């Protein structure tokens, strides 16, 4: 999603960082953990009619969602939201706490004690190979904590330790950010379910998020009301400035046609 006006981002290269190998291992673990939470989300939807897992990695899910709305002809509004400075604003204390919950829940759901890490992927196991890199739940958490404790940046002849935010160039950064936001989204949805606020939850059944860009369909702008309940104050969520009939998302411009029949036009902006 292209931001207007364009936000100023600062990039720091990390190709020779000593933490790169550890970040690569953690990336494979977190990718598997996220996949497990997708399974948890699908089961949650079967039980309660809403999926708390909003994370997507490509546009095919969005295309399918619009195809479903076109078939049913029941799209009413569409809006996007953007976390203005997600990576640079993530509080480490909250990241540790929420990711610890995410990791533990994934291990619990998988019914496995270890993650075996291979060259290109990772998998759940109860019997890791003798010569295979493997981690239990606590070791994954320790690895994440160690990485957060050892983020340093050199600028000229000075060295700074990063205590707020995570470097975008770190291999596992997208998974850390995604799963942090997911933990808030899941817990808020589950809280509303426990309170039996189905009149609220029905407006959050069609949500998709590509890291820091959020797409809401038929939300009736309720996200504007509840976003400060879902996310902490450090993570500022800003709605688009459209009329709710068109919006930018995932490098596309999405439009609902004037006939009010829920259709869409996707046009690349790059």
Where on the chain are the PLM-derived regions?
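Short helix/loop capping segments that flank catalytic or ligand/cofactor-binding pockets
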Residues: 8-10, 20-23, 34-35, 88-91, ...
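Short, intrinsically disordered, charge-balanced linker/junction segments flanking boundaries
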Residues: 1, 267-270
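Secondary-structure transition/turn motif
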Residues: 15-16, 219-220, 269-270
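Inter-domain linker/hinge segments that demarcate the starts of reverse transcriptase
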Residues: 19-33, 58, 182-188, 193, ...
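Amphipathic alpha-helical/coiled-coil segments positioned at domain termini
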Residues: 6-10, 164, 269
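Conserved polymerase palm-domain catalytic core
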Residues: 64-229, 242-249, 256-257
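Long, internal stretches of domain cores in catalytic or enzyme-like folds
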Residues: 237-241
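Non-catalytic, regulatory and substrate/membrane-recognition segments associated with hydrolase enzymes
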Residues: 1-77, 84-85, 100-104
């Amino acid at each position: 999603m292209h931001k207007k006006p364009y936000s100023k981002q600062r990039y720091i290269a990390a190709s020779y960082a000593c933490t790169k190998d550890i970040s690569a291992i953690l990336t494979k673990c977190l990718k598997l953990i996220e996949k497990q939470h997708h399974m948890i989300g699908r089961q949650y939807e079967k039980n309660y009619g809403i999926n708390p897992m909003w994370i997507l990695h490509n546009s095919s899910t969005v295309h399918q969602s619009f195809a479903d709305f076109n078939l049913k002809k029941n799209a009413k509004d569409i809006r996007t939201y953007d976390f203005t400075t997600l990576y640079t604003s993530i509080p480490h204390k909250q990241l540790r706490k929420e990711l610890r919950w995410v990791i533990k829940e994934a291990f619990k759901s998988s019914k496995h004690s270890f993650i075996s890490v291979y060259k290109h992927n990772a998998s759940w196991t109860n019997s890791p190979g003798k010569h295979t890199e493997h981690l239990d739940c606590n070791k994954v958490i320790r690895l994440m904590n160690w990485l957060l404790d050892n983020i340093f940046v050199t600028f000229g002849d000075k060295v700074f330790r990063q205590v707020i935010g995570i470097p975008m160039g770190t291999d596992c950064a997208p998974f850390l950010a995604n799963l942090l936001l997911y933990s808030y989204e899941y817990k808020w949805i589950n809280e509303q379910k426990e309170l039996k606020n189905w009149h609220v939850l029905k407006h959050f059944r069609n949500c998709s998020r590509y890291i820091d860009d959020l797409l809401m369909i038929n939300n009736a702008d309720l996200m504007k009301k509840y976003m400060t309940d879902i996310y902490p104050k450090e993570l500022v969520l800003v709605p688009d400035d459209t009329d709710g009939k068109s919006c930018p998302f995932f490098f596309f411009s999405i439009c609902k046609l004037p006939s009010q029949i829920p259709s869409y036009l996707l046009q690349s902006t790059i």
